[in-house]
Amino acid sequence: MERSKGKVSVFLARLAWAVWILYAAAWSWALLTPQPVRLRDALLDETPALVSSKVVHVAGYLAFTMLSGCLRPAVPYRWLILAFLSLHAFGTEYLQQFVPQRTPSLHDVGLDHVGIVLGLAITWKWWLGTSASAA
C-alpha cells in the first residue's frame, strides 16, 4: 500500500509541474503576442477594455501563484519560485515594448504583484507548510 501511495504522489507531483509549465508557457504567450489585445479591442469599448486588461493582469498572476503553491517544493525553492514570478512580471512587461500593439507599463507590473500577493494570501498554508516531498 505504501509503495502505491508513493507512486501516486510522484505522479501527482509530475502532473502539477506539467500543468505549471503549460500555464507558464500559455501566460507568457498571452502577454507577449498582440492577439489578446486585438480580441479585446474588437469586443470592448475603451474603458471596459482598459479595466478588463488590468483585471486580467491581477487574475493571471493570482492563478500563477496558486498553481506555484500547488507544487509544494522544499522551502528554499519556494522563494525561488516567487522570485521567478516577480521576474516574469517585470520581464514580460519589458519585452512587450518589442511586440506590436503592446506597451510596457510599471503600473501593470504593480498589478501583477497584487495578483502574486493575493495568490499568496489565498494559499499561504501551502507556502508555509511542509513540502510534499517531506510529508
Predicted regions and their residues:
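Bulky hydrophobic segments
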Residues: 2-107, 113-135
